[in-house]
């Protein structure tokens, strides 16, 4: 590699790895006959790309193990949120590597392509050279957002609009949340595209959503005499920030005793929630907004169920698009979510079941449906399950907990926080037990 290229790499805080330098340039030796260093570069890079997609430690390790088995290598892997440490043994030599990614996120489209790569590796890539494999991985690694910031803003608008109805909001709150969430996520995706830091993009996008909701509500008050009671929907306008993937994958990792990955993902999710709710609370104080209860919609049970099915579908579809899922994958997740979330809500309303066990039942249903569908279309299970239950994450409860902490209403704050924690625990539990029931490789500790 030229000196100027190395200079460009070294100017970054997270230096890029010149993967092609580890492959033989003569093109005569296939990867299964190559040296341990070259094999380790392929195994490590596959794990690193999987990690960058937002998937959990179990899936990352499984993918690396499958490649190792084909290449005749023994591999031990320790996975975190942002880094992988692994050792490769071939009976003679040992290679230890520590790899890290510059930023974390969710990209289900890239994850799907990587799972296809791993599935096809014994039949295709195992018969290529290391250089040829790295070229294919270059193509996959360059799969970025398949949607423009405007479309991602629209997806957030649809998701939060549907979310508003599912939380009890009416048409006015839904319209205002649609506008505010759309603009807020548009700003967020623009900031992410320009690589601004996590805290900044959360603070700016959440503040923008709250301000836009309040501004449009004020315009509606002056132009159409809309009562100020509809200010309650401002919470829904910022729910696009909910860290559904790290919340759920942390639970799955903890279930498999991948404590490092599980705790790091949980910490990452908590950071996002704390920063988002703190800035939302500050904006609420500045704009004089209060998280009041929604007005009763007075819908018949049958109509309410039909609307819940429809809104759950669009809510999950929007979130799935935000996770960079192709439209067919997003529609599949939305179908699962519409059934699972409507079941959860109906269990609470019709049977009086507490919210946490109802959330467990909804997540279990989503997991079972996703496992059944995966057998037919091959979509990554996590790309279907997480979007389908992210609308069950109690973002409203978490915000109200922080809001009440801020105004020193400690009794209310603890009540909201306890309710949120119980639901947050129940959601990954539902997916975990669905996985235990349907996946024999997940059922055992090793």
Which functions belong to the PLM regions below?
Residues 240-245, 268-350:
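Generic multipass alpha-helical transmembrane bundles of integral membrane proteins
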Residues 233-238, 249-253, 257-272, 335, ...:
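C-terminal transmembrane helix-loop-helix hairpin of multi-pass membrane proteins
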Residues 162-167, 183-192, 208, 212-220, ...:
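Alpha-helical membrane-inserting segments
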């Amino acid at each position: 590699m030229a000196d100027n290229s190395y200079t460009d790499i070294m100017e970054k805080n997270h230096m890029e790895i010149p993967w092609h330098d580890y492959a033989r340039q003569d093109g005569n030796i296939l990867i299964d006959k190559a040296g341990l260093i070259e094999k380790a570069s392929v195994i490590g890079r596959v794990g690193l790309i999987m990690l960058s997609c937002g998937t959990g430690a179990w899936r990352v390790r499984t993918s690396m193990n499958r490649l190792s088995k084909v290449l005749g290598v023994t591999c031990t892997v320790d996975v975190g949120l942002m880094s992988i440490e692994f050792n490769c043994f071939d009976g003679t030599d040992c290679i230890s590597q520590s790899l890290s990614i510059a930023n974390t996120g969710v990209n289900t489209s890239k994850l799907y392509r990587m799972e296809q790569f791993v599935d096809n590796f014994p039949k295709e890539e195992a018969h290529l050279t290391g250089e040829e494999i790295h070229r294919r991985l270059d193509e996959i690694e360059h799969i970025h957002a398949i949607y423009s910031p405007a479309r991602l803003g629209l997806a957030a608008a649809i998701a939060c609009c549907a979310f508003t109805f599912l939380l009890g909001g009416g048409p006015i709150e839904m319209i205002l949340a649609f506008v505010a969430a759309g603009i807020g996520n548009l700003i967020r995706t623009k900031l992410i595209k320009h690589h601004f830091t996590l805290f900044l993009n959360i603070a700016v996008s959440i503040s923008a959503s709250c301000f836009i909701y309040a501004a449009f509500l004020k315009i509606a008050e002056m132009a159409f005499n809309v009562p100020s009671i509809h200010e309650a929907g401002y919470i829904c306008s910022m729910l696009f920030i909910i860290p559904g993937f790290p919340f759920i994958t942390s639970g799955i990792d903890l279930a498999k005793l991948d404590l490092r990955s599980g705790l790091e993902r949980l910490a990452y999710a908590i950071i996002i929630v704390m920063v988002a709710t703190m800035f939302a609370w500050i904006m609420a104080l500045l704009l004089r907004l209060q998280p009041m209860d929604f007005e009763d919609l007075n819908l018949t049970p049958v109509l309410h169920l039909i609307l819940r099915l429809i809104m759950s579908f669009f809510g999950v579809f929007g979130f799935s698009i935000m996770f960079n899922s192709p439209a067919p994958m997003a529609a599949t997740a939305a179908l699962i979510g519409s059934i699972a979330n409507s079941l959860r809500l109906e269990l609470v309303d019709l049977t009086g079941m507490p919210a946490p066990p109802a959330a467990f039942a909804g997540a279990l249903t989503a997991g079972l449906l996703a496992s059944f569908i995966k057998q037919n279309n091959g979509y990554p299970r996590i790309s279907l399950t997480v979007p389908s239950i992210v609308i069950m994450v109690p973002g409203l409860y978490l915000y109200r907990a922080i809001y009440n902490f801020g105004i020193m209403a400690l009794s209310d704050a603890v009540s909201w926080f306890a309710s949120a924690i119980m639901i947050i625990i129940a959601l990954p539990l539902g997916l975990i037990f669905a996985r235990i029931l349907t996946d024999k490789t997940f059922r055992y500790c090793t």
